[in-house]
Amino acid sequence: MQFVLRKIMQKAEDAFSACTIDLIAAVQSNHSVQVLLNYFQTEQENIDNRITDFFNELSDYLENFQHYRITVGVSSEVESFEQISTAIEMSKEAAASRLFKGNGRRIEYCQEPHTLFSPKDFQNEYEEFAKAVETMQPDACQYQIHKCFRLASDKALFASEFYAMGLWLLRSTYDILEIADTFDVDVQQEVLENLSTVADLRDYVIRQVQQLIKESRSERENRERKPVLEAIVYMKEHFTEKITLEDVA
């Protein structure tokens, strides 16, 4: 971990030293690197481009290490040294609170949550998922949910977008199984927001979908068996007299 952090710190210095007046890079809490840039306003566009390139370079670099992903949080610009502590806190907020652990992209700090998730971007995956739910195939559902989350990761969705996608998959399952009236959006929202990682969210959605399929299948089988069971009961109640050979004779 320390090796990776030192390498990231070095890459930060290489990326920004040529266009800054001062640059301070430091490892924070053994899990992040903090970079403070002092530059002329005329370099703003150059800095923005370098931040984007820096994020992409780190993403490629960390692909060589299992279980490592990069999150970059960028604060708004400040114009006086008295505001530096504010900028640092803003960058922490941008990196830590706006994105799930282990996922991310370069983002500006802002107070409003991002909710850019669009089901249209997952149309093909949804059609396969809906087919798996409709035919009540738990393993196929699990596979399609994994596909949705992989696509979401490739798109580097924001945390709130992952939440929205998980809620959408659950709501869709209720709709397809025709049990939408039992879907409690507030309860599900609260449960989802208590999950801290993408893996936790994905696994929860899989478990819930598979459980709903299991319950719906059982209920459907009971409905299909009910007429048969009622017929058996009727036969037992009305045709229980035994006919012996003597009676026949």
Each model region followed by its residue ranges:
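Catalytic NTP-binding/metal-coordinating core of nucleotidyl cyclase/transferase enzymes
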Residues: M1-K11
